[in-house]
């Protein structure tokens, strides 16, 4: 299956591993901070769903798109293949969606702490938390 779906699977996966390693090392070694400083992105991201369109995330989306685009362009030129869009770009999309779902989990966990603190305060101290405060916390999560 790999031979029919991916262009030259051996060199393809080796180059994908090396390219991903270079991209991760660049981002983690300061390239990510450099890019964020370049666009004057704030270090803090919102707790709400707005974090996914904050400048920090938009910079990472652009970085990922450029990395995938350059890798795909190389393979589209080096070894044109009938399934190249599905194999190269489809795999990149699967990886991105997996990362994004993990980030959704992180966002939900970041929201849990203040929300459940409010619930606990409402349960331990009657009439200290108004229904508006509760709805406001839910509204914060929804963006």
Write out the residue ranges for each language-model feature:
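Membrane-helix interface motif
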Residues: 26-43, 104-119
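Cytoplasmic membrane-interface regions of multi-pass membrane proteins
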Residues: 1-5, 32-47, 73-88
């Amino acid at each position: 299956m790999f031979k029919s779906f991916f262009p030259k699977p051996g060199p393809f996966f080796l180059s994908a591993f090396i390219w991903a390693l270079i991209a991760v090392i660049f981002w983690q070694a300061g390239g990510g901070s450099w890019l964020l400083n370049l666009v004057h992105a704030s270090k803090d991201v919102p707790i709400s769903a707005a974090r996914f369109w904050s400048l920090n995330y938009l910079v990472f989306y652009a970085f990922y798109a450029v990395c995938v685009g350059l890798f795909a362009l190389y393979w589209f030129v080096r070894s044109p293949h009938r399934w190249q869009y599905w194999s190269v770009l489809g795999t990149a999309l699967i990886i991105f969606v997996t990362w994004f779902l993990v980030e959704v989990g992180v966002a939900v966990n970041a929201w849990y702490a203040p929300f459940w603190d409010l619930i606990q305060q409402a349960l331990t101290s009657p009439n200290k938390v108004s229904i508006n405060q509760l709805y406001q916390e839910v509204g914060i999560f929804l963006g």
